[in-house]
């Protein structure tokens, strides 16, 4: 048998990561680069993606940046079109506004739906169009990875709109997987639990919230961004070549209950 560890490599592949400036997106960009991919980092904040790209280059990798708000569809389409070849999309940009269902404003509803669903859909569409331009796509392969959440599989208090958006991504994953299975492009979702990022640390400043989260996770801890990135690298690589239309749940057992 050939060296199976080589199936986890992404040499000669090009990946785009949205929301790549911090947290999970940044970890995914660095992880993909470590696996050999040439990485495009997309985010609204230049300083953050420039720093991440510099770290990749310092380690001997290839990185490019694209300053872009993915909710600006024309700008996003131009940015994706400017990538010469694309093999992997990590559709990561998204956010949450935790609040009780009866207090959700139309403004917050629209903000979450616009970024987490509409923009995610259109980014995936632009990426798929770019991938299909490659004449050898079926043999070369490709992967579109939607950053979902454990909240795309369950529900939770004060997260009604967020759950709506992540359940939508799970449905999109399955529908896209069926359309692209014969074209060489796999489509998967990555569904992490709460992950220790600057955003989580802000929420966990309330001891009762941190206790609730850790009490719900059978492994009794939140995730690390690198653990999510490891799942992304696997899902993007030939090691996952028979996987499509499903979700990699990285949740310490939350959804097993």
Set out the residue ranges of the language-model regions.
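Short, small/polar-rich loop/turn modules that mediate ligand/substrate recognition or access, typified
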Residues: 181, 186, 243-245
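Substrate-binding pocket helix/loop in short-chain dehydrogenase/reductase
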Residues: 100-101, 105-113, 213
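Conserved glycine-rich cofactor-binding loop
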Residues: 14, 21-23
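Alpha-helical segment proximal to the catalytic Tyr-Lys
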Residues: 129, 178-179, 241
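Residue(s) in the substrate-gating loop at a strand-loop-helix junction
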Residues: 149
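Active-site helix of classical SDR
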Residues: 124, 165, 173
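C-terminal substrate-recognition "lid" of short-chain dehydrogenase/reductases
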Residues: 221-250, 255-256
């Amino acid at each position: 048998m050939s060296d199976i560890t080589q199936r986890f490599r992404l040499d000669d592949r090009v990946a785009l990561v949205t929301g790549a400036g911090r947290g999970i997106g940044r970890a995914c960009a660095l992880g993909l680069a470590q696996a050999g991919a040439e990485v495009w980092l997309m985010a609204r904040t230049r300083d953050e993606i420039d720093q991440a790209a510099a770290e990749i280059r310092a380690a001997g990798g290839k990185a490019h940046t694209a300053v872009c708000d993915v909710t600006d569809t024309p700008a996003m389409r131009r940015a994706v079109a400017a990538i010469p070849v694309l093999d992997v999309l990590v559709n990561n940009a998204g956010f949450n506004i935790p609040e009780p269902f009866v207090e959700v404003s139309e403004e917050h509803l629209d903000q979450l739906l616009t970024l987490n669903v509409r923009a995610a859909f259109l980014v995936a569409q632009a990426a798929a169009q770019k991938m299909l331009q490659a004449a050898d796509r079926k043999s070369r392969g490709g992967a579109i990875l939607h950053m979902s959440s454990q909240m795309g599989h369950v529900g939770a208090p004060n997260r009604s709109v967020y759950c709506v958006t992540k359940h939508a991504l799970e449905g999109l994953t399955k529908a896209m997987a069926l359309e692209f299975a014969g074209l060489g492009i796999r489509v998967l979702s990555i569904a992490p639990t709460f992950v220790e990022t600057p955003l989580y640390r802000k929420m966990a400043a309330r001891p009762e919230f941190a206790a609730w989260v850790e009490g719900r996770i059978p492994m009794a801890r939140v995730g690390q961004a690198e653990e999510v990135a490891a799942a992304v690298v696997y899902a993007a690589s030939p090691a996952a070549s028979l996987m499509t239309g499903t979700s990699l749940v990285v949740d310490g057992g939350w959804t097993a209950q």
